[in-house]
Amino acid sequence: MNWIVTAGNLAASRLTKKPLLLASIEDLFFLQPVRIGDVVTVKAMVGYVGKTSLEAEVVVFCKPLHEEEKLCTRARMSFVSSDVHGKPVPIEQRIEPADEKEMKIYRYAKEIREGRLMRIAQRKQKVQDTNLEDIGQLSLRVYRLVFPEDAIYGNLMYGGKLLLILDEIMAIMAMKFAKGAIVTASLDALDFYHPIYVGNILVLATSLNYVGRSSMEIGVKVLAEDPVNNTVQHTCTAFSTCVKVDEHGRPR
């Protein structure tokens, strides 16, 4: 997922020429496993530009040795143009569809944006939701300090790095329960309510929410604690489906 966010960020930053923060990522499904030795191709484009945010699409293909290239996943995400302190700033550049194909991409990206705005209408209230009492009995709590190497713009934590950490923690939770190899099958739509800064203490409250025949749903609630100002913010909550697999990568 870090590669996906990085590709989207690169495409978006080449357009805006400004720092960008990952604001959200839509439902993400992995259609094909990526194995060691596969050739991975990542394509990214900007589909829509708003006042301070934009929509990006990333398509990932994988090509195993002696096989045809296959679609691995398609990700849609939004970025917010910001200053080094995390405050939104206007995007001066605009894009115009050149043909009917691009017009369809433009309209669909705009529809996704409008749907997400409805989803995050209560963002200010969700930032204050720092309760961890409801994370369940099968839980794992991890504390992590945000270092300068976790940021690429100023003192703001990079969204791709956070997704990498979340994927790792959810995999640990799934493996501890399943007692075997697992793969990430999907990630539910994820919205960021507040930036994370260098020096913050991340609280990652992980819980096992559901168990099926071969799959599990893992949830992680992320809080960012400022030890200097003694404040805690709810940054995001992620839900992922992990699947237990055998030595050939088949569900078991």
Identify what each model region corresponds to.
Residues 1-20, 160-182:
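Active-site helix/loop of acyl-thioester processing domains in fatty-acid/polyketide metabolism
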Residues 21-41, 64, 71-73, 183-194, ...:
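A cross-kingdom feature marking solvent-exposed beta-strand/loop segments within repeated
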Residues 8, 150-154, 170-171, 183, ...:
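Domain-wide signal for the mature, well-folded portions of proteins, strongly enriched
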Residues 91-152:
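Non-catalytic linker/capping segments at the edges of enzyme domains
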Residues 5-6, 156-158, 168, 199, ...:
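Catalytic cores of nucleotide-enabled group-transfer and carboxylate-activating enzymes in metabolic
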Residues 25, 141, 153, 182, ...:
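Short coil/loop residues immediately preceding or within conserved phosphate-binding loops
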